[in-house]
């Protein structure tokens, strides 16, 4: 059976973006860990920041390394089983890191109120596998409603929009940019 072009575009528009599901999961986890999400999918001509979040030092488990609130630029990599790049870790190349750095600089240039924040680049690795069509209960809830009901812990799977998602690794201060 072949689909005409209008059927194909309808199918594609209804397909769920698993990358966005991964970002939703990580944002929920960050909120549960006491982070405030400032921006999601912030874009400029240089690139995109998946999540920009802040946390006060008083709410950190190990606050000895930070004198000021933390501003985290979080790169989320969502991958299915059997991927070729170590669940997205190998996709954060030096080139990608430089692009994230430049994008973060542009983000900060318009926000003088964040000048004293300790900035870092974190990487969140999410596994995502299609499991089945949405249950009747899930079909009645938007993705936002489904997310609001989730409890997210590193290493534990959750079901969202017919997918099984696992935040399997969160790497704080995943890389440092060396300025030459």
From Swiss-Prot:
Record-linked InterPro entries: Restrct_endonuc-II-like, tRNA_endonuc-like_dom_sf, UPF0102_YraN-like
Protein name: UPF0102 protein Tery_0733
Entry's family note: Belongs to the UPF0102 family.
Source species of the chain: Trichodesmium erythraeum (strain IMS101)
Any matching Pfam family: UPF0102
GO molecular function: nucleic acid binding
């Amino acid at each position: 059976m072949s689909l005409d072009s209008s059927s194909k575009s309808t199918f594609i528009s209804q397909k769920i973006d698993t990358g966005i599901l991964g970002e939703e999961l990580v944002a929920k986890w960050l909120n549960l860990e006491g982070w405030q999400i400032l921006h999601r999918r912030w874009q400029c001509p240089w690139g995109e920041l998946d999540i920009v979040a802040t946390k006060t030092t008083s709410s950190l488990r190990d606050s000895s390394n930070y004198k000021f609130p933390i501003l985290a630029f979080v790169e989320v990599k969502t991958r299915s089983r059997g991927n070729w790049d170590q669940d997205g870790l190998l996709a954060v190349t030096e080139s990608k890191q430089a692009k994230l750095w430049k994008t973060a600089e542009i983000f900060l240039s318009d926000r003088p109120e964040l000048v004293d924040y300790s900035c870092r680049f974190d990487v969140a690795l999410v596994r995502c596998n299609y499991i089945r069509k949405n249950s009747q209960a899930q079909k009645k809830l938007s993705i936002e409603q489904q997310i609001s009901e989730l409890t997210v812990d590193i290493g534990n799977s959750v079901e969202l929009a017919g997918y099984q998602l696992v935040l399997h690794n969160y790497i704080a201060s995943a890389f440092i940019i060396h300025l030459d």
